Structure formats: C-alpha cells, structure tokens
C-alpha cells in the first residue's frame, strides 16, 4: 500500500510539473542580463582536466583509464586522443584572462587524480600540487572563484589494473585519501568542492554499454567489449561512488569545514523527461526514467536509499545500504550540481523486447526515451546526435528538484550546446554562433523564471564550456566552446560571437 501511495504521489508530481511546462512561455523570449538574477548569483564556465589540460606525461602525471581508452583503436570517433587537448596545462594564465575579460565570476575545473598520486595511491607528486596551486592563485588574483571537481572520469589506470577501480570498495579509502590531500593543500582557498562529475554517465557508458572508459559491457554478445557485466556492474559502480562521496563529505565536515568555511556537493547529468502522452502509464514511465537517472544517486544522498522503483525492478542486483551506511549517505551534501543540456519524451516500454535481449541496466527502467514523437522532434538539434534544444526543460527540472527534494541549493554546473568541427567550415563562419547565443539566452530565461516566479533555489550557472575541447568519444569532432580553438594553428583562441553576447550579459545590471 505504501508503495502504491508513493507511485500516486510521484505521478501527481509529474503531472504538476508537466502542467507548469505548458504555462505561459513568454519568459523564454524575454530580455535578460546579470541583473535579472538574484544578487550574488554566480556565473562561470566549466571544464575538466582530461579534456583541457593535455600534457599527459608532464611533471610526473600517471596514466588514466581514458589515456588507455583513447589510444585504443576504434574507440574515438575521429581517432584522436587528448595527449595535447587544448594545452590548458601550459596556457592557464591566458585562459584565466579570457574569463576575466568576459566578467565571469567563477571557474569550475577538475583536478587530475594522477597528477597528485600518479599511481592513485602512495607518494604525492609535488609538481602536480604546485600546478593546481598556481591555477587557483591565478584565478583568485583575477577575482575568479575556483569551483573544484575532484573526479571527472579520469580514474588512475593503476587502480583499475590492481582491483578494477570503481568495482571494488577498496577505492573508497583510496579516493578519500586523495580528496583529503586536496583539502589540506588547496582548501584554504577553495570554498566549493564537487566530489564527482556525472556518476550516472560513467557508470552506464563505462560499465553498461562500453562506449566510454574503461569500456566494459556484455550487451550484443560482447561484440564491442572483452569483459564486464552490463546487468550488475553499473549498480556496483554507482553504489561505491555514493559511499565514496559520503565518506569524503564526512571527512570534510569533521576535519576541514569549520576551519576552511567551504561547502561540498556533487554534479549529476540530468535530462528532463516529458511524458509522451497524458496516459498514466507514460507519466509513470517519465517518473521511472528520472528515478533511474537522477534518483539513482540523489535519492540516497537525500533520503538514505534508492528509489522504490529501482528496488522493485532491479531486485537483488541493486546493492543494499546497511543502516550505518544509510545514515552516512543521507544528507551528505551542501548543494546539488546539475549538468543539464536537453529534454526527451518518455513512454512506457510495455514489451521491453530490447531489454530482454540486452539484459542491461539501461533497460531496467522499462521506459523508452527519445527526442522525437512520431515524425516531429522535441526541438532543434545541436551538432551532437543526442542534444536537442528544449529550454522549457530547464524550468521543469528545477521545479521537480524543488518539490521532490525540498528545494536544496542548486548550481547549474554545466549547460551548453555544440557546433560541428569540420574542415568545410571556415574559422570566420565558425565564429558566428547565433544558435549558441539563442541557446544560452533561452535556457537562462527559463532558469530565471524558475527562480523568480517559482522560487527555485538556484545559486549559479556554469557554461560548458569556455573553450572548444576534446569531447571524450567524440574527440575533436564537436565544438562546445565560447572560444574557437584553432587545432591547425597552435591552438590559438578566438572569441565567437557568444563571447561578446556573454560579456554584454554579464556587464549589464538593467
């Protein structure tokens, strides 16, 4: 009965948010600026170490699973790697000045675990410590606040070789030791910590479908992967990530928070899902899709356990929190980071034939999520095949978080769109990115409405990304940056039109 009441409650919540989505959309076209947002609202750009730094063998850095994966033939769309990336390791001062020129308040970047501990554990690489001290100090000297991510997918290869990394609970202690060194060495200046970036993505892409490092899966009769278990490993990885986050949070709160005055959160990848129809089964399917995405990680951190839909559908394959673990996990964050790019339709998957064939975690939700209904797409497409432009989804998602999780502090830790990188597109034409300007204008308008009209507790917004960069399995085929990086001319940075738009936006208080 309790389970049925919960389903009814969540169904009503999905219906309410869907109705809000259909409300007056005039805010989407409203003129906005920094002054449209609350005083103290943070604007910044985001990056990750592996996608931006390059210098993979410089000054004692150890190899990561993404070094291995990107050098494996056929894994990257354009057969590239991130050995150089956009060379931010050497050009950080130039890039910090670009942020300053725009009027950005903050920079979200990640620390490479193997620059601090080349083998994941053991001796500390002081050259790595020195590099991040220089970056943090350079940011602060320009009035830019560092928001530091401790893990953005670049697991030390040594730990994967030794005990399969996130599949082994040993990683909890090893990551905690790494995190504590970061708190000790950087915490006097870093006031916002993010433990993990998109655990849902690296659990699914790395351990279910095998399209990202470390490339483990059993779908399609192991045609694309040599080892793994797509029906169990994603849940084991997710469980160990949640326990690791909670352990690190406990350490920070007990030993560093009072002295350093910082806060600690985690960043999730979150699509919004609209029911494909007003049928109850599709509304419930949209809720399940969200349970198996955001709820998988945020429910334990807020409530101490996984969503009931996951418990009932995954069964014994879903790990169980002990009583003490549940207490440790519950409430172990100060803010929620949301990486939001797009919205899909969701419908009930009554037959689940594909799920029966694949027998993997993706199919467990019993939903089909697609960016089109019939012959119509949900919005215009960016360059990436998965990224459709649906600004209203931002407002709907913020309201969902408000109502389900009690309106916690939220930072939009990533939002952006890409253009294709093609030799047929001249640099002159690539700088004319009106589509990106409209994307950010409309998503920011939707976000502003969620704050001003709906009372959502959103504290900041980070653009992905300052620079074009190496986009994981897509390599250099995709350009997300506000600045164009010329890969054929010494990685020179050129401002796109969106830089000028953001500069005007950030320097206007009207």
UniProtKB/Swiss-Prot annotation:
It comes from the Eukaryota. Glycans are attached at residues 229, 278, 349, 507. It catalyses: Hydrolysis of terminal, non-reducing beta-D-glucosyl residues with release of beta-D-glucose. Disulfide bonds join 217-225. This is Beta-glucosidase 40. The gene is BGLU40. Gene3D superfamilies: Glycosidases (3.20.20.80). Residues 1-29 form the signal peptide. It comes from Arabidopsis thaliana. Belongs to the glycosyl hydrolase 1 family. InterPro entries: Glyco_hydro_1 (IPR001360), Glyco_hydro_1_N_CS (IPR033132), Glycoside_hydrolase_SF (IPR017853). GO terms for biological process: carbohydrate metabolic process.
């Amino acid at each position: 009965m309790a389970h049925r009441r919960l389903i009814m409650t969540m169904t009503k919540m999905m219906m309410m948010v869907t109705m809000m989505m259909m409300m007056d959309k005039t805010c989407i076209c409203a003129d906005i600026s920094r002054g449209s947002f609350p005083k103290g609202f943070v604007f910044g750009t985001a990056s990750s170490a592996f996608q931006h730094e390059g210098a993979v063998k410089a000054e004692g850095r150890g190899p990561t699973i993404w070094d291995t994966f990107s050098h494996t033939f056929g894994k990257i769309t354009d057969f590239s790697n991130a050995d150089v990336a956009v060379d931010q390791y050497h050009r950080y001062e130039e890039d910090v000045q670009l942020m300053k020129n725009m009027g950005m308040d903050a920079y979200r970047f990640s620390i490479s675990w193997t620059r601090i501990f080349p083998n994941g554990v053991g001796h500390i690489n002081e050259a790595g410590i020195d590099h991040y001290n220089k970056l943090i100090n350079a940011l602060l000297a320009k009035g830019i606040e560092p928001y530091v991510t401790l893990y953005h997918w670049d697991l030390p290869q040594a730990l994967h070789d030794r005990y399969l990394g996130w599949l082994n609970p040993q990683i909890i202690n090893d990551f905690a030791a790494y995190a504590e060194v970061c708190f000790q060495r950087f915490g006097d200046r870093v006031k916002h910590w993010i433990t993990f970036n998109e655990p849902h993505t690296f659990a699914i892409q790395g351990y279910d479908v095998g399209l990202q490092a470390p490339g483990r899966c059993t779908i399609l009769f192991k045609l694309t992967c040599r080892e793994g278990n797509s029906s169990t490993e994603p849940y084991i990885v997710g469980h160990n990530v949640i326990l690791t986050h909670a352990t690190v949070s406990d350490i920070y709160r007990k030993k560093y928070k009072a002295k350093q005055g910082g806060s600690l959160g985690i960043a999730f990848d979150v699509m919004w899902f609209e029911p494909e129809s007003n049928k109850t089964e599709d509304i419930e399917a949209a809720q399940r899709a969200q349970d198996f995405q955001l709820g998988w990680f945020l429910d334990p951190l807020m409530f101490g356990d996984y969503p009931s839909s996951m418990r009932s559908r995954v069964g014994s394959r879903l790990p169980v929190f002990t009583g003490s673990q549940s207490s440790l996990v519950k409430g172990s964050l100060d803010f929620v980071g949301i990486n939001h790019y797009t919205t899909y339709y969701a419908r009930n998957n009554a037959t689940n034939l594909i799920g029966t064939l694949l027998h993997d975690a993706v199919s467990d939700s019993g939903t089909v999520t697609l960016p089109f209904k019939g012959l119509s797409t949900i919005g215009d497409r960016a360059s990436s095949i998965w990224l459709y432009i649906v600004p209203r989804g931002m407002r709907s998602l913020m309201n969902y978080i408000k109502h389900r999780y009690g309106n916690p502090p939220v930072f939009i830790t990533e939002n952006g769109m890409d253009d294709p990188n093609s030799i047929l597109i001249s640099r002159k034409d690539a700088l004319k990115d009106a589509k990106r300007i409209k994307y950010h204008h409309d998503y920011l308008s939707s976000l502003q409405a969620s704050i001003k009209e709906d009372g959502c507790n959103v504290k900041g917004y980070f653009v992905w990304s300052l620079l074009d960069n190496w986009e994981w399995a897509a390599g250099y085929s995709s350009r997300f940056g506000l600045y164009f990086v010329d890969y054929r001319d010494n990685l020179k940075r050129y401002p796109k039109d969106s830089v000028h738009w953001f500069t005007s936006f950030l320097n206007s208080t009207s």
